[in-house]
Amino acid sequence: MIKRLLIANRGEIAVRILRACRELNIEVVIAHSRADDRQRYLALADDTVCVSARSYLEGTSFVAAAQSRGCDAIHPGYGFLSENAEFADLVTSEGL
């Protein structure tokens, strides 16, 4: 059972995932870059973690962020890493 989820996406996609998590009583951590520091959707999350702008394409950064915040799983959202099989393998191998 997932209790805490890292959202590895931005903007409206992150909000849609967050809303679904709320319905399922799953805590949400949103990963973001410094460029998004002041985005309003971040205030909706239970927690946030800042990653570098390049991290949206580097799966290891999201895995490290999820582990540092006690997440059980990562939702890649749409685009970025969602279509990357190596990222899926990495997440699985790390027990997320």
Question: Which residues does each predicted region cover?
Answer:
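ATP-binding N-terminal substructure of ATP-dependent carboxylate-amine bond-forming enzymes
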Residues: 1-96
